[in-house]
A protein has these predicted regions:
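N-terminal basic, low-complexity leaders that serve as flexible interaction/assembly modules and, when applicable
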Residues: 1-87, 91, 124-128, 134-137, ...
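Proline-rich intrinsically disordered, low-complexity coils
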Residues: 34, 44, 58, 71, ...
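A short, surface-exposed interaction/processing loop segment used at functional sites
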Residues: 86-110
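Active-site loop segments of alpha/beta catalytic cores
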Residues: 1-14, 102-305
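Short, charged/polar low-complexity linear motifs in solvent-exposed/disordered segments
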Residues: 81-83, 93-96, 255-256
Length: 305
C-alpha cells in the first residue's frame, strides 16, 4: 500500500493517478488507493451534508466546517487539516456533528430520506482507473461499513458509550446505515472494478471484544459479503487495525476473500501465524513494518520481509 500522503510527498498530488504513478516509479503493483463509488440521491429540500473551508492560516492550517442539515435540525462539526507542515494531508476531526440523541434522530431521518431517493450508481472514476491501470494495477474500491459511518460522525468514545446507553436507537441506526452500505456495495458490483475492501478499522480498532464486535460490527461484513457473493468475478476484503486475533475466526467464517493489515505496531498476531491458521481459507496481507521500508537500509527491508 502506497498512501496518498506519500504520493503527495513525492509528486505534490494525492489523487489515484498520483498513487499509481508512484507505484510505477517503484515497480510495485497498485492495489489500494483513493478510489470509491457513490450512489446518486436527490434529497428533498432542506436535507444536505456538506463540507466548507472556513479558515486558512498563514502556516497552512485549514479549518473545515462539516454540516448535516435537515428541515428541523442543523448539526455542525469541525475538521482541521495542514497542522503538520511535512505531512499536510493529515487531518483531525476536532468536533463531531452528532452530539446526542436528538442529533441521532435527525440523522436517522436524513438517512431514511437518502434511501427513499437513492437512484443510479456512480463509478466514472473507477472505470477510468481500470482502463488506465490495465494489467499494472488493481483499481480496488473502498467501501464504508455502517459501524464506521456512524462512529466517524459521533467520535469513537461517545459512539461506544451510545452502544450501551441507547442500544435500541443505535441498532435502528445501524440497520438503516447497512441499507445505505448495501447500495454502495451494489454500486461496486455494477462497476468494472473486480476488488473492493470494507474499511472495518474503526470497529477492530475499538478493541471492544468478540461479543460486542459480533453484535455491533460483524453484520456489516456479513451483509456486504452476501451482495458480493451473488456477483461473478467480484472480490471483497477487509481493512483492519489493532488486535484482531480473537476476531479472525468469525471474520474468516464470513467468506471474505482477503484480510489485511496485521500491523506489527498495535496488532496481536503475525502474518505467519495467521497464514498457518487461516491461509487455506483466506488471503492474508500486510504485517510489514513501514518504518523499516521508509527509513531502513535495503538489508533491513530484506530481513523484515
Amino acid at each position: 500500500l502506497i498512501h496518498h500522503r506519500f504520493a503527495h510527498k513525492v509528486l505534490g498530488r494525492s489523487d489515484w493517478r498520483a498513487v499509481f504513478e508512484v507505484h510505477q516509479m517503484l515497480g510495485s503493483i497498485h492495489f489500494r488507493g483513493p478510489l470509491g463509488v457513490s450512489v446518486r440521491s436527490s434529497l428533498p429540500e432542506g436535507y444536505s451534508e456538506e463540507w466548507h473551508e472556513v479558515e486558512k492560516s498563514p502556516d497552512g492550517r485549514v479549518t473545515i466546517e462539516w454540516v448535516i442539515r435537515t428541515p428541523k435540525r442543523t448539526m455542525k462539526g469541525k475538521i482541521v487539516r495542514g497542522m503538520i507542515p511535512d505531512d499536510p494531508l493529515v487531518s483531525k476531526t476536532v468536533e463531531y456533528p452528532i452530539k446526542g440523541v436528538e442529533d441521532w434522530l435527525a440523522f436517522l431521518d436524513f438517512r431514511l430520506r437518502w434511501l427513499e431517493n437513492a437512484k443510479e450508481p456512480v463509478f466514472d472514476e473507477v472505470a477510468e482507473a481500470v482502463k488506465v491501470m490495465g494489467e499494472d494495477g488493481i483499481a480496488s474500491v473502498g467501501l464504508t461499513p455502517a459501524f464506521t459511518a456512524l462512529a466517524e460522525r459521533r467520535g469513537m468514545e461517545q459512539f461506544l458509550l451510545d452502544l450501551y446507553d441507547y442500544p435500541d436507537l443505535i441498532s435502528e441506526l445501524l440497520e438503516v446505515e447497512r441499507q445505505v452500505m448495501e447500495k454502495h456495495v451494489e454500486a461496486f458490483v455494477s462497476s468494472p472494478a473486480e476488488v473492493a475492501w470494507l474499511d472495518i478499522c474503526w470497529a477492530t480498532g475499538a478493541d471492544m471484544g468478540p461479543k460486542n464486535f459480533e453484535k455491533w460490527a460483524l453484520p456489516d461484513v456479513v451483509r456486504a459479503m452476501e451482495k458480493v457473493r451473488e456477483a461473478k468475478g467480484k472480490y471483497l476484503g477487509l481493512y483492519t487495525l489493532g488486535r484482531i486475533r480473537r476476531l479472525l475466526p468469525m471474520l474468516v467464517e464470513t467468506g471474505v476473500h482477503f484480510i489485511e493489515t496485521f500491523e506489527p505496531n498495535q496488532g496481536d498476531i503475525s502474518l505467519a501465524e495467521a497464514k498457518r491458521l487461516y491461509g487455506d481459507r483466506v488471503c492474508i496481507m500486510g504485517n510489514y513494518n513501514c518504518l523499516v521500508l521508509a527509513f531502513g537500509t535495503v538489508e533491513d527491508a530484506r530481513e523484515e520481509a
